[in-house]
Amino acid sequence: MCLAYQSGKTSKNGYEYLDDQLGSLKDKVKINQYQSAESVNDLWEARGYKSPYKEKTVVQNITLTEDTKFVRVYDGVNSNLEGGWVMRAEDIKGLTPKEIQAEFALEYEPIFIGEVELKAGDTIHLGEIGPNFGYDGGGIQIDLQQQWIGDFTELGKIEDWR
């Protein structure tokens, strides 16, 4: 039996889909577990949150094998530099704040960007964003799993960074 996933506009076999999710992280992680988005969403819903992951996709539980930099976007009022969700810089480079909001299904349009360095040995979730706040999502998000990890550094306004 061959695993196949349809995500966005393309259909891929299971391994291609999972490799695409990892992107530039592929050689920097150890994969601990594959979980259904539904099972991870159930955990978030039990805590009173909306489902963060797209249904019928896979969430990867991974451990970083080397120090790795990510970015976090925020508006400075409703969200701040430090927080539990980050993304790869290459996933938002060149996007406007409105495009980032749509791709990552953010409640508020981000204004600022910060760099987040996670350490080798940090364990995180990585998966495809589901619909929220009137947006379809579809981007790949990294969940710090409610751990207080990472070194957060302000980079400035998204418009100046992109």
Where are these regions (language model features)?
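Catalytic toxin/effector domains delivered as secreted proteins or via bacterial secretion systems
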Residues: 2, 9-162
